[in-house]
Amino acid sequence: MGKNVVVLGTQWGDEGKGKVVDLLTERAKYVVRYQGGHNAGHTLVINGEKTVLHLIPSGILRENVISIIGNGVVLAPDALMKEMTELEARGVPVRERLLLSEACPLILPYHVALDNAREKARGAKAIGTTGRGIGPAYEDKVARRGLRVSDLFNKETFAIKLKEIVEYHNFQLVHYYKEAAVDYQKVLDDVLAIADILTAMVVDVSELLDNARKQGELIMFEGAQGTLLDIDHGTYPYVTSSNTTAGGVATGSGLGPRYVDYVLGIVKAYSTRVGAGPFPTELNDETGEFLRKQGNEYGATTGRSRRTGWLDIVAVRRAVQINSLSGFCMTKLDVLDGLKEVKLCIGYRMPDGREVDTTPLAAEGWEGIEPIYETMPGWSETTFGVKEHSKLPQAALNYIQRVEELTGVPIDIISTGPDRDETMILRDPFDA
């Protein structure tokens, strides 16, 4: 029986991970975020009530679940407090259910200022970041100058370290980017005001997870963003700053890599992308607008409209390889309802005429690529809210089967609407 399950996106994010994690955590004891920060936007709909989480794991609404923010996550204290306050106002006892790794790097105002200054300076070459300081915080981590949650235990030392790093970043902000300096005293006061709240939630995450594993507890790891945004394996440089793939679980939580039992890849029935970067199947026509409107494709974090296109099997196959996927959950199948035909990208035609069935690595390699499509009949019947596999339209079943054939991975879960119960679990990852 699988006990440790990873849930991650197979595309460019926004696949519907939050809903699936929330659904499957009915059985889990722990839900762990292992990378990213509050640039994620995980939307849950339970009995018609919508909740958008950015930093706190999607298991927080379950009474039986302990939610953990692992060391691979960059943590913005102000964003965490805002999210905690909103949830507590709705009666969710966050402080009883949420734990933090002391090794989480902190995102502070100078990271946000740098993020926005750089995007502004890039002009037409902007990456399309969320402007929340994620990249600069990871830079400080790798440069070994960043502050971490553990630094909050000694406030005097924290103040000294903070002064040094504020001076360092302010020099760059003022003299290179010609932007305003960050106020050291305000940053210090704001962080110290909530330091005790954060340190009270600190645990040894690696030890906790290892003990839970030994006791046979069910653990779920919640990925943010998507495989094709991975810092190493994504469409570089149009990527995020963390490892969004299954490999990030071990480094971002402290669980040994051999202890992952099942990797669930969330795949949207079509493709979307927010921000700049390659997108071979993008549709800038009526069909693209149809998908955007029907799928309500607007970012949960930024509110930006998402780019839309047909499902790219070539890119998804790359996700299968990198993540050693055990199964898929297909989301938003209902968005395709009403289309006369649906298409799957099964290969790329390169600028020199060659046909390939693998993805390039760097963004430059995607330039001039044309998708090669396989066209299938669409369906006029609704799939929205359907909860039995046999009651799906035959054309929709054919589409699902073809995705399985082309990827070599079974679709174990099908989502037909935003609500928790608008889902078919054909094979439970915890039992696989």
Curated annotation (Swiss-Prot):
What positions does the entry give for IMP binding?
Answer: 14-17, 39-42, 130, 144, 225, 240, 304
Report the enzyme's class at the first EC level. Answer: ligase
GO cellular component, as recorded: cytoplasm
- Catalytic residue positions: 14 (proton acceptor), 42 (proton donor)
Q: Quote the SMART domains the UniProt record gives.
A: Adenylsucc_synt
A GO BP term, please? 'de novo' AMP biosynthetic process
Q: How is the cofactor bound?
A: Binds 1 Mg(2+) ion per subunit.
- Taxonomically, the superkingdom here is Bacteria
Which Pfam family is one of those matched by this entry? Adenylsucc_synt
Q: What is its main location?
A: cytoplasm
Q: Which residues bind substrate?
A: 300-306
GO MF entries: adenylosuccinate synthase activity; GTP binding; magnesium ion binding
Question: EC number(s) per UniProt?
Answer: 6.3.4.4
Name the cofactor(s): Mg(2+)
Pathway named in the protein's UniProt entry: Purine metabolism; AMP biosynthesis via de novo pathway; AMP from IMP: step 1/2
Location within or outside the cell: Cytoplasm
Q: What does this protein do?
A: Plays an important role in the de novo pathway of purine nucleotide biosynthesis. Catalyzes the first committed step in the biosynthesis of AMP from IMP.
The UniProt similarity line reads:
Belongs to the adenylosuccinate synthetase family.
Which PANTHER family has this protein been placed in? ADENYLOSUCCINATE SYNTHETASE
User: Which protein are we looking at?
Assistant: Adenylosuccinate synthetase
> What species is this protein from?
Yersinia pseudotuberculosis serotype O:1b (strain IP 31758)
The beginning of the lineage is: Bacteria, Pseudomonadati, Pseudomonadota, Gammaproteobacteria, Enterobacterales
